[in-house]
């Protein structure tokens, strides 16, 4: 077989026939994927990654670097250049720049090599579909920069400026229960339940802002299920953070670039550090770093300053959101009928009253499949206040009357329960 490597080149080419083929995006409607996010890794020297809690809380394992994005054709095909001799991962993005699936492995192209794949995590026994696609015959795209040149994704550089601009006006006091989102304080009480040699000697060097905001996101984590993830199972919109913003959290409206930064942070497994020199054990890795640079040159990897990050943004002015007048609606209702297990004894206003307990059997568990249960709870007849004053889309609160009791699921339906139907 003739050698396909061209040592004088610094790039390889990736040809993707159909991003919708394969189980990776099974069920995702055609036309949903608009771009591919292209990233790479700065793999961790000893004691600077993995389960030690060094790069972030519960992940990622290594520092993730954002290279840029490429366009996807309407038929799901794409052809683009990637840096040669570089570990590369891709993430299919929707129209809002949010990953529909997470690639937790990587591939590497030799200089001048053309790599091809049929789809997103297609079966290794699949063969290419014999049809011409739109990307075929086109000049391979160059990767488009993403809000600047290639760099490690750092919370302090990418996410904290967003919080400084939109959030710190209400989230900068320590004497209340709100998340503290200023980037000026560091946590001192970090612990880890993950197996390994995690300790504050290596891990937990994060700001309180990161620790508090981290609670509002959902992503695979560092030791997630090794099986392929369900498409959109960890989509950014599944997180409480994105849902709050979408609901109009006290009328806070982020610009599109800021929303993209939050989405990328979630898609990258919510890291804190974006370079080695910011990690506490950096001084202990001198030999590893020296050998790494030697091997990069020896094996033709692109020369990169892996420690480069732009200067930390300063002087960001807080933008106070407009607070339109809203009608909060009803705020009190006598004779609230629902069961409160914390009330001892349960007293509603002037007399004991619990319409739910009065129903007798008001809880029920149904086995909908072997080992899969659905817990139900009975709502009594009566009146209640529907809505909340927490978010604009939950107002105005309204008194609603229920004419007769009915059963309802006690919790949201899980994917496992849904599949049982």
Regions found by a protein language model. Name each.
Residues 29-59:
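Extended low-complexity, serine/threonine- and proline-enriched intrinsically disordered segments
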